[in-house]
Regions:
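Thiolate-centered catalytic microenvironments shared by cysteine-dependent enzyme domains
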Residues: 2-12, 61, 65-157, 177-178, ...
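Positively charged, proline/Ser/Thr-rich regional signature most characteristic
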Residues: 6-82, 155-228, 269, 275-278
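Short active-site oxyanion
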Residues: 28-31, 109-111, 162, 231, ...
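Mixed-charge, low-complexity segments
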Residues: 228, 240-241, 261-264, 269-272
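C-terminal soluble interaction/assembly domains
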Residues: 229-234, 252, 257, 269-272
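Helix N-cap/beta->alpha junction signal
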Residues: 236-238
Length: 278
């Protein structure tokens, strides 16, 4: 039996299933965004618009793409300021959670939901698929950056008060054994390691991967020493996996999560950064 007190600070409204999407997708105030890297043209949830998640990042400056460009893309998809946005990807939710985080960073907090299990969950239950690009009445959207939802390299170097650095990469990246394409290997000094994909359950018989239930996630993050009283700073290589953990922490009610947007792409290639290797 679940103690209802355990559920009070969970944000269950952020996660939806295919039946919820089916019920609400024709509502003009609900906008579906397909964040998959490929496959949209072959078939997608009817009414969904494709978003290029790579375009959400300005790689040269290790930060978000310009707000005006994002606003134009979203308005073309029919997003207006009061809309509810439902995001999905193929199923592991790395791309969908990246989109979720960027939308929340730009002021749409609590207006974005994520389809648990993504497109795989939708097709597994035999829901309708469309190859049509939907028409959309252009939206009118106000976006404002929320500085308390991100940290910079300089913030970390200055010493963030009451913070906890959370490395969401693989164990080999954390240890410094896998450098990928970076000049330095290792992790931010003092960072705790908890890999992003530990938040996902095993694939079901249809191959659908969903998030573990919220109470399990809450317990596992607590057991890993991720204290909700602190400012949690997830990071990875480019803040896709870090954004996945941002979403999970939002789901289970952590109040102060500020990903390091530059992540290892910046930290692992700058001259003036300290690293810890195992």
């Amino acid at each position: 039996v679940t103690d209802s007190r355990d559920l009070n600070d969970l944000n269950a409204h952020l996660l939806v299933d295919p039946s919820w999407v089916e019920k609400h997708r024709r509502n003009p105030d609900i906008i579906l965004l397909d964040a998959r890297a490929k496959g949209y043209a072959a078939g997608h949830i009817p009414g969904a618009h494709w978003i290029d998640v790579k375009a959400l990042k300005d790689n040269t400056s290790h930060t978000f793409a310009a707000v005006d460009a994002l606003r134009a893309v979203l308005e073309k998809c029919g997003v207006s300021s009061g809309a509810t946005i439902v995001v999905y990807d193929e199923g592991n939710s790395v791309l969908a959670t990246r989109l979720f985080y960027v939308l929340e960073y730009y002021g749409l907090r609590d207006q974005v939901k994520l389809l648990n299990g993504g497109f795989a969950a939708w097709t597994a239950v035999g829901k309708e698929v469309s190859a049509e690009v939907p028409d959309a009445e252009e939206g009118t959207l106000a976006l404002f950056a929320e500085p308390l939802l991100v940290v910079t390299k300089e913030d970390i170097q200055a010493g963030l008060k009451d913070s906890l650095l959370l490395d969401t990469r693989s164990a080999l990246e954390y240890a410094g054994a896998d450098l990928r394409s970076n000049r330095k290997g290792g992790h931010l000094p003092g960072a705790i390691h908890k890999e992003w994909k530990e938040a996902l359950g095993a694939a079901d018989t249809d191959g659908v991967v969903r998030f573990k239930d919220a109470l399990t996630l809450k317990r596992e993050f607590a057991d890993a020493g991720i204290n909700p009283a602190k400012t949690i700073v997830p990071y990875c290589q480019s803040n896709q996996r870090g954004a996945h953990t941002y979403f999970v922490l939002r789901l289970i009610g952590y109040p102060d999560i500020r990903p390091y947007e530059g992540s290892w792409e910046e930290w692992g290639n700058d001259e003036d950064t300290e690293v810890t290797r195992l």
